[in-house]
Amino acid sequence: KTFGCESGEPTFRYSLIDGVNDPDGPYLVNPTVVDARTEITTKLLADKGYSVMVQDDDEEEEETYFARDFEKKFFSDETNMMLVKTFMDNAMRDPITGEVGKGIVFCVSRKHAAKITQLLNVYADKMFPEMYYSDFAMQITSDIQGAQDYTINFQNNNLSGNTKFLEGYKSSKTRICVTVGMMTTGYDCEDILNIGLFRPIFSPTDFIQIKGRGTRTFTFNYKTRANGGWEEHSYPKTNFKLFDFFGNCEYFEEKYDYDEVIKLPQISASG
């Protein structure tokens, strides 16, 4: 009663939309939400689940898996590779260097994070030969020594040093942090341009917090010499991409209207 909250209703609420549309702002930016479900992740999400034939001794048995089983009971290297390829090929780029914009990828487990980190580094080496040398992506989980320091370095744009794309440009060489839950809450990195949901999310609080990692405003700046002086190049961050591979947005809001839909080819998988 002291604070006038006996009704249970908040006396003040400041939403993402409020932050985007604030007349004194904007103070936040909206995501461009990408529906990137594969055939397999779509079936894992269905009520009937995803059924595959599994060899058990001399017999084949049908096993049915659901979203909660991904990277716990159901494993598919092809699906993980498809997630990585889709993310890399469609990620927002840094407006100054043209390299993949900084991002955070959320995985099911530490083992899953290790797999995805390796796949991202291999794919980045093909896209940008000799630019990263396995520093493109870094696993940031609680079992990694120095992980907390890595998150700070990523925030300060010196994780693995600075980008090799443009001398003097203050941006991390490491572009993607791969985590499970460490960077979900209380982490503020303003120049994030890409968020990858490589796992299903069932907690609305976690979903809101993860989405919030990309909403901070930022201006990308770089100065070049021109006509005996300096010319400043400035690009305000107007949005970020949220890659939803497991229909998380639809899970929390039925018939969610995605901003972009990527049709992915069919792949095979085994349990």
Locations of regions flagged by a protein language model:
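Interdomain helical connector at the RecA1-RecA2 junction of SF1/SF2 helicase-like NTPases
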Residues: T2-G101
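Long, largely alpha-helical accessory region at the distal end of helicase-like NTP-driven motors
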Residues: Y65-K72, M82-K85, F246-G271
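Short, conserved catalytic or adaptor-binding loops enriched in Gly and charged residues
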Residues: G4-E6, D18-G25, M127-Y133, E167-Y169, ...
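Conserved RecA-like P-loop NTPase helicase motor core
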Residues: M138-P265
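Flexible phosphate/Mg2+-sensing switch loops adjacent to catalytic phosphate-binding sites
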Residues: T2-Y14, D125-D135, F218-W230
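Short glycine-/polar-rich loops that comprise or flank the Walker A/P-loop
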Residues: S7-F12, D24-N30, V100, Y132-F136, ...
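Conserved C-terminal RecA-like helicase domain
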Residues: E63-C177
